[in-house]
């Protein structure tokens, strides 16, 4: 997990270098769930990331923060459907809406996908907390610039479920016919499950909260065997996601330095 000392460190470091780097603001909702294997793919492309942890007395990213993208993570037993709503739900929906209006790429994962859905005019339906191992099928050959696998596995640890607005495009469906990955606008993406999930993340979520999904022990054993497959499937997914969110393009930190020079 990222170990920056303050919420400003990654942004300060990225802008202080001779060749400024892109920085992603990551909203974390539980101690157990983080970017997981996605971290390695970002670091390998010289993309920094900074976690914001309102659940641990931290603050949400400010409106002025020069983030090149916003990632909203899952929330364990927290949801957005009215049963056990995330305490900072309203603020995060508004923050997401602001980032979308300014053109910043947004990626919502699990609960984060619900927040993104609400920010773009969709809704959320109540549903019990579940841990599901699913098979997803691509619905568009050009999804994620053609890098989304035709079929892939998805692990969903989530309460409630997003109900997409009509203008959203479903990029993949799970084997139950539900949206697994979807897109709204040019650069906002929702994932029902965390593509970078690790076995230890799910184990930590189970230990972190008193509420545990039904059949969690059985699903954990299945997930243990699935780890190498998930790791391989993440490679093309991250390639496409980084391209579609322009995270290899000129970072905001670089543009701000150019503006200061001018």
Task: Name each model feature, range by range.
Residues 27-29, 54, 111, 193:
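Cofactor-binding loop segments of dinucleotide-utilizing enzymes, especially the Rossmann-like FAD-
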Residues 20-25:
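Extreme N-terminal starter segment of soluble prokaryotic enzymes
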Residues 33-37:
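Short N-terminal binding/cap micro-motifs at the start of the first secondary-structure element
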Residues 43-107:
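Flexible gly/pro-rich beta->alpha loop and the following alpha-helix that scaffold active-site loops
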Residues 11-14, 26, 139-262:
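Amide-donor transfer/coupling interface in amidating biosynthetic enzymes
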